[in-house]
């Protein structure tokens, strides 16, 4: 038939708000195509009814749902290009702001200098860099090795120089094991050779990194290297003249009247050499401050504002660096560390950082 119908059970009519009285049940004659109304009583023999009203209501609800979904889908499709353009605009704007901030940052300029600022810049492969690094390490090892051999030739004289701070206190040194003095002279020669060969190591490091430095950085490199070297040797000298005698005299006076001072030659030189080198390294505090100020990471005012924490940090650093546990040595090292920090902070502030 041309007319579409739907057959439904009678027990679902209340779900659509319909009752038997609202419908006009129709029976279809399949042979003639004629339909005529039936009473509900007569319809009890049939299991199903042909209900046009229910079919129309279901179809109307389905059409409403489809139209609503189509409207929402169309709105989403229309709004999508606008949202995409807006997101792309925000991303491009954020990227431009990031680039502008990076160009104004000292760290960005340090990591990505322009080619005009690199006079000796040239393209090199990773293997060329490794080859150059190998050569410079080899030269540094040769320089330090030669210095160690030279110091070993005068090892006994160096031992006497390092024994001088406590010679006047009546301290005697003993060799407690076979070959202890021989290995002690090797240790003294190694430390002294490293000290004398450090300029060669420093030169090779500078020669390796200087092609990647700008003109402004090269101007800044000279004072940094010179200041670092001066402070390192000043720290060693300060340790030999002040810290070592103070610490050793403290131990001698503390044991006076109770025990005789007979010290192991190996442990004595280990104590003295470690104290001297750790003091030289701790004197590099102003250099670190200048580097941080030059990069714009910390200002001079900020360094000066945290001086209370610096006092505590200097005492803790002195306790860690010094191999002895006496408070006198720690105070004698903490005081110059605090002075160096304050001096470095004022230098950064005067430099306009």
UniProtKB/Swiss-Prot annotation:
Record's miscellaneous remark: TATC targets to thylakoids via a stromal intermediate, and then probably integrated through a thylakoid translocation pathway.
Keyword Transport: yes
Protein name per Swiss-Prot or TrEMBL: Sec-independent protein translocase protein TATC, chloroplastic
Protein species of origin: Pisum sativum
One Gene Ontology term of the molecular function aspect: proton motive force dependent protein transmembrane transporter activity
UniProt cross-references to InterPro entries, sorted A to Z: Sec-indep_translocase_CS, TatC
Biased segments, Basic and acidic residues type: 77-86
Family: Belongs to the TatC family.
GO cellular component: chloroplast thylakoid membrane; TAT protein transport complex
Gene Ontology BP, a term: protein transport by the Tat complex
HAMAP family, per database record: TatC (MF_00902)
Residue ranges of the region described as Disordered: 63-86
Pfam families given in the database record: TatC (PF00902)
Membrane-side (Lumenal) residue stretches: 158-192, 245-270, 324-330
Sorted UniProt keywords: Chloroplast, Membrane, Plastid, Protein transport, Thylakoid, Transit peptide, Translocation, Transmembrane, Transmembrane helix, Transport
Primary role: Part of the twin-arginine translocation (Tat) system that transports large folded proteins containing a characteristic twin-arginine motif in their signal peptide across the thylakoid membrane. Involved in delta pH-dependent protein transport required for chloroplast development, especially thylakoid membrane formation. TATC and TATB mediate precursor recognition, whereas TATA facilitates translocation.
Subcellular location: Plastid, Chloroplast thylakoid membrane
Recorded superkingdom: Eukaryota
Stromal side: 51-136, 214-223, 292-302, 352-353
């Amino acid at each position: 038939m041309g007319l579409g119908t739907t057959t439904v059970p009678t027990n679902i009519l209340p779900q659509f708000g319909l009752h038997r009285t609202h419908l006009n049940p129709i029976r279809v004659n399949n042979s003639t195509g004629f339909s005529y109304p039936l009473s509900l009583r007569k319809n009890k023999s049939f299991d199903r009814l042909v209900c046009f009203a229910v079919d129309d209501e279901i179809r109307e609800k389905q059409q409403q749902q489809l139209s609503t979904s189509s409207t929402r889908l169309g709105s989403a499709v229309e709004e999508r290009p606008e949202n995409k353009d807006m997101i792309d605009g925000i991303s491009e704007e954020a990227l431009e702001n990031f680039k502008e901030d990076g160009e104004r940052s000292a760290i960005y300029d340090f990591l990505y200098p322009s080619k005009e600022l690199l006079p000796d810049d040239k393209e090199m492969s990773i293997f060329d860099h490794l080859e150059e690094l190998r050569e410079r390490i080899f030269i540094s090892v040769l320089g330090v090795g030669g210095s160690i051999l030279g110091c070993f030739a005068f090892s006994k004289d160096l031992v006497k120089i390092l024994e001088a701070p406590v010679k006047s206190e009546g301290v005697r040194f003993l060799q407690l094991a076979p070959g202890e003095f021989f290995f002690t002279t090797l240790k003294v020669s190694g430390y002294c050779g490293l000290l004398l060969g450090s300029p060669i190591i420093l030169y090779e490091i500078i020669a390796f990194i200087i092609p990647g430095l700008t003109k402004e950085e090269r101007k800044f490199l000279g004072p940094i290297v010179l200041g670092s070297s001066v402070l390192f040797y000043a720290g060693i000298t300060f340790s030999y003249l002040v810290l070592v005698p103070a610490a050793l005299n403290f131990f001698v006076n503390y044991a006076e009247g109770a025990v005789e001072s007979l010290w192991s030659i190996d442990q004595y030189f280990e104590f003295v050499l470690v104290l001297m080198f750790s003091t030289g390294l701790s004197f590099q505090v102003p250099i670190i401050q200048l580097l941080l100020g030059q990069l714009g990471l910390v200002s001079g005012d900020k360094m000066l504002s945290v001086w209370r924490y610096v006092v505590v940090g200097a005492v803790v650093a002195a306790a860690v660096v010094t191999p002895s546990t006496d408070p006198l040595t720690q105070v004698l090292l903490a005081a110059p560390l605090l002075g160096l920090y304050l001096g470095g902070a004022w230098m950064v502030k005067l430099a306009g950082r």
